[in-house]
């Protein structure tokens, strides 16, 4: 074999070996990356939140996760009373964000909530069909309905009943009332025409931070006491504590105000 041929063979062998080495290094790098990812999975932070928080909670999650890259905040929405009952029965939850103070206080009394904080206020409003000119629940006709949340499990339902009692209107409309599992269902009933009026929170009139044109706000239903939202940690997770601290921050308060809550 000539010297030139020998050199050509040696060069070819070197190139092949180098290619194999690079391929192996790349494979090892991929395996290492996969291993690192699997070694550091995101921690789930489970938050049970009142249905009226379904929009703003997503904005709060986005802001919180900016500084907690290894946390995935998930939400379970419903009426505050129903959520509290789930927690009492052992449902896995790290934070409870209620639309009242009563349900948080009940958990706190039984050592099922701690680090509590009153983080927002809201306004009850009476809504009706977008084309309606009715001004009060007294204007409801015999076959028309008034939707409110379940009084025992939905704070907005309790507030609505309280308002009707305070205004001496309950006896006039009690036979027209249809009950809903949460305020979002009340809104849906009025939007779809299943009820001609309903009581919801002012914040429920906004979707994706835009005011709905599907219903008409008839009037604000002022109560003797303000509607106060309270939250509490329901597990010993360090991220539950950090979420509670986050709710006290200026950033969280600015987000709540942006979504029409009062802080």
Predicted regions and their residues:
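Sec-dependent N-terminal signal peptides
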Residues: 7-14
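C-terminal motif of bacterial Sec signal peptides marking the signal peptidase cleavage site
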Residues: 15-19
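Short, high-confidence coil segments that cap the C-terminus of an alpha-helix
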Residues: 70, 92-93, 195
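Short beta-strand-centered segments that line the small-molecule binding cleft or hinge
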Residues: 84, 90-100, 104-118
């Amino acid at each position: 074999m000539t010297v030139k041929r020998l050199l050509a063979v040696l060069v070819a062998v070197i190139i092949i070996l180098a290619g194999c080495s690079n391929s192996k290094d790349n494979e090892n790098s991929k395996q290492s990356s996969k291993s690192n990812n699997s070694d550091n999975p995101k921690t789930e932070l489970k938050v049970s939140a009142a249905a009226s928080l379904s929009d703003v909670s997503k904005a709060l999650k986005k802001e919180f996760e900016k500084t907690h890259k290894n946390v995935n905040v998930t939400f379970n929405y419903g009426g505050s009373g129903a959520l509290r009952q789930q927690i009492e029965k052992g449902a896995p939850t790290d934070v409870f964000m209620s639309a009242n103070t009563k349900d948080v206080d009940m958990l706190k009394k039984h050592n099922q909530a701690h680090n509590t904080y009153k983080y927002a206020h809201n306004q009850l409003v009476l809504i009706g069909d977008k084309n309606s000119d009715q001004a009060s629940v007294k204007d409801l006709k015999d076959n028309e309905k008034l939707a409110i949340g379940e009084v025992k499990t939905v704070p907005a339902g309790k507030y609505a009943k309280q308002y009707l009692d305070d205004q001496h209107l309950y006896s006039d409309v009690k036979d027209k009332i249809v009950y809903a599992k949460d305020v979002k269902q009340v809104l849906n009933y009025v939007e779809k025409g299943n009820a001609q009026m309903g009581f919801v929170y002012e914040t429920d009139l906004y979707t994706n931070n835009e005011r709905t044109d599907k219903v008409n706000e008839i009037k604000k239903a002022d109560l003797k006491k303000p509607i106060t939202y309270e939250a509490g940690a329901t597990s010993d997770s360090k991220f539950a504590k950090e979420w509670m601290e986050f709710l006290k921050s200026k950033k969280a308060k600015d987000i709540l105000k942006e979504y029409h809550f009062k802080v």
